[in-house]
A protein has these predicted regions:
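N-terminal secretory/membrane-targeting segments
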Residues: 1-80, 112
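Solvent-exposed soluble domains appended to multi-pass membrane proteins
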Residues: 58-353
Length: 353
């Protein structure tokens, strides 16, 4: 009955996305996807007749002006240390600030009173690579695969490249193996020094699971590494990607009220918040803390499926800039995305880019 595969698509008629995905999760759709394993650009882009498209490209090449923007700040440029933390699967809905009564994120919620908070910031996608792509390149998601997973993705005008040109040491911390999702190739090819699970000595690991070392171990590694870098006199930019808030939701015992063997999402969220709080406490005792800006956000929400095609609340993530010496506390109610986060920081610091 495989000849009926194209006919099978007619059953995808419900307004409920759950139902459509459920009926598609079978032999027919699998075989159809196997046959059509290519990106259909006609589905994503409007097209022009070839002669019209050629004329437009020809005119673009003849342009005597600049085809890119250069942002010049009127303010004095400052070069503090910058730490960007992307929290795994941290939905805004877990926080008391956005209506939760579960008490899972006391540290994030308490930080809101000390930071510049973006109350309507949304993720660009529902996978880690999409969040990393957005905060690293400040680009909207392209159809098909993320840029991070594509070939020929080195030497891009990334956050790290821009800051490296300004004299920063640029590092990417990941508690797992950065081979995952092509992170090693992407970040390494764009000037980041990678510190992942392969760089940990045995005595630096107190707990690990299938995803890597615990968030506490990852943050402790970052504290030690950044302390060494700070002594060089050069500013540093550190991007830290957490891992613990992910199935199977296992973490060190005795840290939070939810038992570590419960393997619950609530436990993963609460431990992730706990570990972040410990990291900020440890950082506050370091000599470099007063000259550091912390940017805290998430890669994506815990889940993004819903009864509508794009359930907006399933893309709402926390985002804040915490820097007592540089950025006044407050809140921003304008709608924004992960692609806006780093340009906003650069503007606050008076950086040209």
């Amino acid at each position: 009955a495989l000849w009926m595969l194209p006919f099978n698509t007619r059953f995808q008629t419900s307004d409920n996305v759950y139902y459509n995905e459920l009926q598609a999760n079978g032999l027919y759709k699998f075989y159809e996807a196997f046959l059509k394993n290519e990106l259909d650009y006609m589905q994503f882009y409007r097209t022009l007749p070839e002669d019209r498209a050629a004329a437009l490209v020809h005119d673009e090449y003849r342009s005597e002006g600049q085809n890119h923007r250069y942002i010049t700040s009127p303010n004095e440029e400052r070069h503090p240390n910058i730490v960007l933390v992307t929290l795994e699967s941290m939905s805004a809905s877990f926080m008391a600030r956005y209506g939760s009564s579960d008490g899972l994120t006391p540290r994030l919620d308490s930080l809101c009173g000390k930071a510049l908070v973006f109350d309507r910031l949304f993720a660009t996608g529902n996978r880690t690579v999409r969040g990393l792509e957005a905060v690293t390149l400040s680009l909207p998601p392209c159809p098909g695969q993320s840029i991070i997973k594509r070939p020929r993705n080195a030497g891009m005008h990334s956050t790290g490249a821009m800051l490296r040109d300004k004299g920063y040491d640029v590092l990417y911390f990941y508690g797992g193996n950065s081979y995952f999702d092509n992170m090693e190739t992407f970040f390494g090819g764009n000037g980041y020094e990678i510190v992942d699970q392969k760089q940990y000595a045995p005595d630096e690991i107190t707990f690990q699971n299938i995803w890597g070392v615990s968030d506490e171990d990852s943050y402790a590694k970052a504290i030690r590494t950044l302390g060494q870098r700070a002594r060089s006199g050069r500013p540093f930019f550190a991007h830290i990607m957490s891992v613990s808030n992910h199935r199977p939701y296992t973490y060190p015992a005795g840290r939070i009220p939810i038992p570590n063997d419960a393997k619950s999402r609530a436990g993963g969220v609460m431990y992730s918040d706990y570990a972040l709080g410990g990291f900020l406490d440890a950082a506050s005792r370091e000599p470099w803390f007063g000259n550091t800006v912390f940017v805290i956000t998430a890669d994506h929400c815990a889940s993004s499926a819903g009864k509508t095609e794009i359930p907006l609340e399933k893309y709402h993530i926390p985002a804040m800039i915490y820097a007592p010496a540089f950025v006044a506390p407050g809140s921003v109610g304008k709608t924004a995305s992960q692609i806006d986060l780093m340009p906003t920081l650069f503007s606050l610091l008076g950086m040209d880019y």
